[in-house]
Amino acid sequence: MLFQAGVVAGGAPKAIERCRVLLDAIGRRIFLAGADPAAAAAIKIANNFVLGCAIEAMGEGFSLTRKYGVAPQVFYEVLTDGLFAAPAYKVYGKSMVDESYAKLCQMAVLGLKDANLALAAGEAAGLPLPCGGRLSTR
């Protein structure tokens, strides 16, 4: 296995089955999105969109707690020891504690692409995505 990410596959079941060995080799788990390949793309975009919104909210949480004199490490520990113990919160939260913004800036550029794709997909579906509007203007 090359990496630990899951692979989202969309398309005709026979086509996915033909690719199964490759999909199993590159991901820890295969998620079947259905017969429409666009569904797999929507999942990928939505996944990164949610991550971008989470990073934005986390940054605001760090800013708020700093304004009240809370040490960033304390907020980080509270945040990642409970409901937000997921790797994304631990990795990006640690970058905020350490004020190592280079990684966050790099991810923001990549995240902006998917935020804009999510906004376009939402617009095409007649679905407003208010968090995405914030991400695309930051």
Residue positions per predicted region:
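Short beta-strand and adjoining strand-loop segment in the mid-core
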Residues: L2-D24, I30-A33, A46-A54, F62-Y68
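Helical "substrate-binding/catalytic lid" subdomain
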Residues: P37-R138
